[in-house]
Swiss-Prot record:
Family: Belongs to the PAL/histidase family.
Protein name according to UniProt: Histidine ammonia-lyase
UniProt keyword annotations, A-Z: Cytoplasm, Histidine metabolism, Lyase
Catalytic activity, EC: 4.3.1.3
Source domain of life: Bacteria
Gene Ontology terms: biological process: L-histidine catabolic process to glutamate and formamide; L-histidine catabolic process to glutamate and formate
One annotated GO molecular function: histidine ammonia-lyase activity
Catalysed reactions, semicolon-separated: L-histidine = trans-urocanate + NH4(+)
Gene: hutH
Modified residues (2,3-didehydroalanine (Ser)): 142
UniProt xrefs under InterPro entries: Aromatic_Lyase, Fumarase/histidase_N, HutH, L-Aspartase-like, Phe/His_NH3-lyase_AS
NCBIfam families xrefs: hutH (TIGR01225), PRK09367.1 (NF006871)
UniProt organism field: Burkholderia lata (strain ATCC 17760 / DSM 23089 / LMG 22485 / NCIMB 9086 / R18194 / 383)
Post-translation changes: Contains an active site 4-methylidene-imidazol-5-one (MIO), which is formed autocatalytically by cyclization and dehydration of residues Ala-Ser-Gly.
Length: 507
């Protein structure tokens, strides 16, 4: 059970919400602020004075006054008309994060929503009744309206859900959670819809996957150093201290730890080779830059996870209703775009190491890592697959945040595209996962070919894990299943666990 303290969520909590089947409860310390916000909205609605989002239309229709007897209909219509998403359902882990983030934002007491509505969201979450939310349809301002409308429609008994993973109607989902359809009061529909929770949830969910891939890439890169008979001297701490970038310093330390005591390395200390290619030698510099970007993105997304991104905002102490633009997800878009650059570079560097290993001139290994080359093609086309994926990532890494299209009759004339920026991270991560799987297979093959010498004590379990699933490549065979089984292990963090390094979300 995780106690949500609005405004004080942590990265480990968020990773746990996404990756584990934990349940949620709301910190009772937040109740007074929530109730005060709801009372403030009720008082404003009762007076009848125009207040945006409470008794007016929305967007370009903000100047249209809504009579008091139509306020409930206004909120219902808002939810139903905005539930216009398309595409595949959002991943379960992302929906869980979305709901938790929405509860945190509402729980800070500046949205004017009743606890009854929040309690319903918690009951759905804890019963594993998750709204079916189409993943496409948000431009990231005014908030993630369409995705959050699909979440909110379930509270009205409209739409679809997944009940413990099985697709069902919203009404069935409410029954399983012990709920009846709600009637939303003034501003409650808008409070549920307005916010950056969809884009932030997608970005966080994919960031956790990319963090795992980063750790896997450290392991794969270190194994490739041994496979290519590369030097460990470029990882000397003194080199990296002189430059000063913390990510680079930390990455170099990881490579030193992983490669310490390698018999392969000891076997070629007196060789004539002066310098390794950049894909081996510059790993700390490249991976360090990725790490710095990822850490910055995590900081930004944690702030956003704890933010109130509603509009308008209620200030119960003064009775004021202030309209602003906290729904604009530009910080999330930038963070997601930075993560895309990092994840793409992780894959690009791994692809270059695969190319090095299969090149006999550079690696000193048999061409394409197989004996009897010619009749056997070995890793030739596995590298082509890695190259295809790396190239695809370069296109996917184009920043989404540089694009904007005006909406709502030019009232909403600049938008963030944060949801797309966050959503495409999943494709980049999947591509990078498969590139790393191919590298792990190639590096393991190279290490085998260095016999009688072995890799380091820290990397020996990696070899055992790989060889426990995939045999040494002796002769050409149907290769795709080998890649698939190692990619599955990558996704399960089997190799990430070996890296002597952890992110803030894992602590």
């Amino acid at each position: 059970m995780i106690t949500l303290t609005p405004g004080h969520l942590t990265l480990p909590q968020l990773r746990q919400i996404a990756r584990e089947s934990v349940q949620l409860t709301l910190d009772p310390a937040s109740f007074a602020k929530i109730d005060a916000g709801a009372k403030a909205v009720a008082d404003i609605a009762a007076k009848g004075e125009p207040a945006y989002g409470i008794n007016t239309g929305f967007g370009r229709l903000a100047s249209t006054h809504i009579p008091h007897d139509q306020l409930e209909l206004l909120q219902k219509n808002l939810v139903l008309s905005h539930a216009v998403g398309v595409g595949e359902p959002m991943a379960r882990s992302s929906v869980r994060l979305l709901m938790a983030l929405k509860l945190s934002s509402l729980g800070r007491g500046h949205s004017g929503i009743r606890r009854e509505v929040m309690d319903a969201l918690i009951k759905l979450f804890n019963a594993d009744v998750l709204p079916l939310i189409p993943v496409k349809g948000s431009v990231g301002a005014s908030g993630d309206l369409a995705p959050l409308a699909h979440m909110s429609a379930v509270l009205l008994g409209v739409g679809e859900v997944f009940i413990r993973g099985e697709r069902a109607s919203a009404l069935d989902g409410l029954r399983v959670a012990g709920l009846a359809p709600l009637t939303l009061q003034a501003k409650e529909g808008l409070a549920l819809l307005n916010g950056t929770q969809a884009s932030t949830a997608l970005a966080l969910d994919n960031m956790f996957s990319i963090e795992d891939l980063y750790r896997t890439a450290l392991v794969a890169g270190a194994l490739s150093v041994d496979a290519a008979a590369g030097s460990v001297k470029p990882f000397d701490a003194r080199i990296h201290e002189l430059r000063g970038h913390q990510g680079q310093i930390d990455a170099a330390a990881s490579y030193r730890d992983l490669l310490a005591g390698s018999p392969i390395n000891q076997s070629h200390l007196d060789c004539d080779k002066v310098q390794d290619p950049y894909s081996l030698r510059c790993q700390p510099q490249v991976m360090g830059a990725c790490l710095d970007q990822m850490r910055h993105a995590a900081d930004v997304l944690l702030v956003e996870a704890n933010a109130v991104s509603d509009n308008p905002l209620i200030f119960p102490d003064t009775g004021e209703v202030l309209s602003g633009g906290n729904f604009h997800a530009e910080p999330v878009a930038f963070a997601a775009d930075n993560l895309a650059l990092a994840a793409s570079e992780i894959g690009a560097l791994a692809e270059r190491r695969i190319a090095l290993l299969i090149d006999a001139t550079l690696s000193g290994l048999p061409p394409f890592l197989v004996r009897d080359g010619g009749v056997n093609s070995g890793f030739m086309i596995a590298h082509v697959t890695a190259a295809a994926l790396a190239s695809e990532n370069k296109t996917l890494a184009h920043p989404a945040s540089v694009d904007s299209l005006p909406t709502s009759a030019n009232q909403e004339d600049h938008v963030s595209m944060a949801t797309f920026a966050a959503r495409k991270l999943a494709d980049i991560a999947d591509n990078t996962k498969h590139i790393l799987a191919i590298e792990l297979l190639a590096a393991a093959q190279g290490v085998d070919l260095r016999a009688p010498y072995h890799t380091s004590p820290k990397l020996a379990p990696v070899m055992e894990t790989i060889r426990g699933k995939v045999a040494h490549y002796e002769l050409d065979h149907y290769f795709a299943p080998d890649i698939a089984v190692i990619a599955k292990l990558v996704g399960e963090r089997a190799f990430a666990k070996v890296a002597p390094f952890s992110f803030a979300s894992e602590q």
